[in-house]
Amino acid sequence: MAESLTLQGSGGRRFWSLLAGAGMIAASVLTIQHFFNANFPESIFRGAFCDISAFFNCDSSAYSPIAHFHGVPMGYFGLFAGLLVVLGSLFPSAAFERTNKFLALFNALGVVGLFVYSVFFLKSLCLLCSGYYVFSLLSFFLFWRFGLARSFPSIKLLAVFAVLALSGAYGFQRFYEAKKEAQFGGVAMKVVKEYYSLSEVRNPSFISPFWTARASERFEDAPIRVIEYVDFLCPDCLFLYRQLKQLEKEYEGRINVAFQFFPLEAKCNTVVEKDLHPGACDLSLIAAHDPAKFKAIHDEIFENFQKAKSPEWRVQLARKYGAEAALNDPAVKDLLLRIINTGAEYEKTSDTFAHGVRSTPTLIINNRMVIGTLPYAHLKAIFESLLSAGPEAGEKGRFMENWVDTRPKKK
């Protein structure tokens, strides 16, 4: 039998193929884990570990429309492809190698497609996904450089792989549904408990006059009060926007939401030593130019999240709402700075950061600070608990008595 990538006399090549497959598996497992952690967190104390900047971050991918297919995370298909490469290296055969070589082509095409989608549509790049891209392209190179010349795949193996892949996909789909259901049940109850365990904090000395929901003239008079420190170019803030947009409708007349500008850009924010989102300051100035137009501008920015990263789009936005002067208006700049600087009023919650408000989004819900975003189910559970508790909501240990199961009723 002729020497090839995984067959006789090619121990070194088999090792590299095994390494590529193992890398594909590792990157896929981490990607799947991040997908579920981002979309179905099980704690209020959750944080992303690979969001370095507006471009290099994983949350954009985790929240994207193609992050999963009917509940099956995209990373599962990479996991399965990597597993086949590893098995083909450990148990080599001509049929296995030909089939893997055939599949490597489609995997490489998929990788290129995902890379283009990520960079040019999402305008970001997931580091975990990038690891998979690198190992996949290495595997593709090895198969097409050293693989058997006769590359027609084994139909039998393809059929077996298809059945196994569908079986695994079904398992992930069921797991996805279980995680989704749990968000309204036991996980939500745990989050409510964690929420009440948080120490109370005061409201900022200056509450932004820019609100996305108003139930009363005085901020303190609504039963549900949310102050959100937000950056318009933060992927997690986009996720939060979608959750609050739905909840603001459901709790209309009972909720006040104040938008506390906190762009993570050194151009206008000196509270945190982060310069992650170029353009966030300009977007904040445009939105703060006219309180009467704030809500419309706020919604348009988030509804065009990817376009908002473009300087040209921001110029068009300012022109559309007559806010061209905002970028150089001293009064608007002073107002924005006054709002941003309230982030420095809170005691630090970590030795790593100087202040409590250090990232976006940061929420203050009825005088308790939550760092990071929360999904709809968790926010709804907290809101229901606050409404059911009334003035006693501030007492520790009340979450169990105030608990409301928010799961949709099954017919």
Task: Tell where the protein language model's regions lie, with residue ranges.
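Membrane-interfacial helix-loop segments of redox and metal-homeostasis proteins
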Residues: 2-177
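Soluble or luminal CAZymes and related metallo-dependent hydrolases
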Residues: 10, 278, 282, 331-339
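Local sequence-structure signature of Cys/Sec-based thiol-disulfide redox active-site neighborhoods
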Residues: 23, 119, 216-246, 359
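Post-signal/leader-peptide non-cytosolic segments of secretory proteins
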Residues: 69, 199-211, 399-404, 408
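Membrane-interface segments at or immediately adjacent to transmembrane helices
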Residues: 175-221, 227
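Structural alpha/beta surface segment adjacent to cysteine/selenocysteine redox centers
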Residues: 227-232, 238-319, 353-355, 394-410
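C-terminal cap of thioredoxin/glutaredoxin-like
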Residues: 242-248, 315-411
